[in-house]
């Protein structure tokens, strides 16, 4: 953990470190504040405190959904290649994602009875929009990663043989060469700041596909029908947002640390990207494929062992998210071990 955070604060000004400390302080304060509101609202209703704990747990769980992590980790690496420190990428993504859920919760609380039929109709359209936006984005990420992987592998081989390190070869995606680079450059040109993840998070949330989001909406509907005041019901989405923002922010900070270590030296940068870029492409393809197949199975009512397995994977994105965290962590650790055992740092690089 400390090595990762050290990687984020590479410059001597101390600003990244101060920003991380401030970010954690704000998130902790937000989490504490949300719980204080819950205690104040439900102090005479211990059952509702249990429901509040459930909403918070839903946020913590939803933060590690596979589509969240794949989008955050890949965009973090892209912004790191642009020379930025996107430690708030995960925060902005989660805020965009949760804002849709919060808005829906408010609408449901206001119109608990009349909105239910409309919610079903919106789910039909929203699920298609949200899933397609998520899957297409991840497929584009996978294609871009494969372009970067090809460029990094060629540059690494040349440098190891005593050749000259050419930065433009590594950054093929952002140069003027390459067919896929020209196709997908507009997509990544849009995301040039951490806050650009906010609208992307909103797109990912439109479908209300996951059990966590549906459960939170169900909680809002249930409590509204019981006569719980609107401001008290808002505690549930606030807790959901607090939990999700905390975990997604931690993820982007950890990824910044891993990528910062890799970019300290040209050879290290090339070697690391050959390993982590390959994993990123595979993860993006798998997650995007699962989402697309799940959408096809749902809309065309496809049955069978294969489609049942696809449905199970879509219903358990949380578990898949933990697998992704493990894959990225193991890949990063193994790349460091192999890199040091082979003494790649001792390679002379001619720029």
UniProtKB/Swiss-Prot annotation:
Q: Per its record, how is this protein called by name?
A: High-affinity nickel transport protein
InterPro entries linked to this entry: Ni/Co_transpt (IPR004688), Ni/Co_transpt_high_affinity (IPR011541)
Q: Which organism is it from?
A: Cupriavidus necator (strain ATCC 17699 / DSM 428 / KCTC 22496 / NCIMB 10442 / H16 / Stanier 337)
Key words of the record: Cell inner membrane, Cell membrane, Ion transport, Membrane, Nickel, Nickel transport, Plasmid, Transmembrane, Transmembrane helix, Transport
- Please report which protein family the annotation says this sequence is part of: Belongs to the NiCoT transporter (TC 2.A.52) family.
**Where in the cell is the protein located?**
Cell inner membrane
Q: Which regions of this chain are Cytoplasmic-facing, per the record's topological domains?
A: 1-19, 73-94, 150-199, 265-269, 338-351
Q: Which domain of life is it from?
A: Bacteria
